[in-house]
């Protein structure tokens, strides 16, 4: 919260940009994933050449599915690596970029490939923790926001993207507190 206040105090015009839906230039999902894969190499261990496919959710399922998801491949083949994008979801280019960082590189796809290459004991495939898996991908979104700032020509681009990320983080904290309050403490 203090970081957001500090950024806005130094540059109050960023609030107008947030409200005016200032955005990244439009990019194709495949181009975003290629860029993310390249940028990931600076911050995380390299992966072997990884094949992946981007597909779109069928019209009949668009109403019921999330904005995007990574389809985990079978254990014995580790392929195919598929990311589905829901085209019915209205999102900004920045949201698409960070969603693909969550689902692709350095998110779920990266995590799955990296884990598989460690040749873990078979028991580790049987015991999974969705908290660990989603925790990693949510943590990774901060990198997605950092990487996205490289695509803004605006002088305030990195501050704008940082402020957007901080806003998302604050919202996730609020959701968590409400979830605990409602389901543990019985708030109504």
Name these PLM-found stretches.
Residues 1-188:
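N-terminal maturation segment of proteins
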């Amino acid at each position: 919260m203090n970081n957001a206040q500090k950024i806005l105090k130094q540059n109050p015009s960023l609030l107008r940009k947030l409200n005016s839906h200032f955005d990244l230039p439009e990019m194709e999902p495949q181009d975003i994933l290629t860029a993310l894969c390249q940028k990931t190499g600076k911050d995380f261990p390299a992966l072997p050449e990884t094949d992946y496919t981007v597909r779109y959710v069928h019209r009949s399922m668009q109403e019921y599915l999330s904005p995007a998801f990574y389809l985990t491949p079978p254990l014995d083949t580790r392929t195919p690596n598929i990311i589905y994008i829901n085209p019915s979801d209205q999102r900004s280019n920045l949201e698409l970029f960070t969603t693909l960082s969550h689902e692709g590189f350095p998110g779920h796809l990266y995590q799955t490939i990296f884990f598989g290459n460690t040749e873990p004991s078979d028991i580790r495939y049987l015991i999974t923790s969705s908290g660990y898996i989603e925790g990693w991908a949510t943590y990774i979104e901060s990198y997605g926001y950092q990487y996205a700032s490289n695509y803004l020509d605006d002088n305030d681009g990195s501050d704008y993207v940082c402020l957007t990320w901080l806003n998302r983080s604050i919202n996730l904290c609020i959701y968590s507190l409400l979830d605990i309050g409602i389901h543990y403490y019985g708030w109504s």
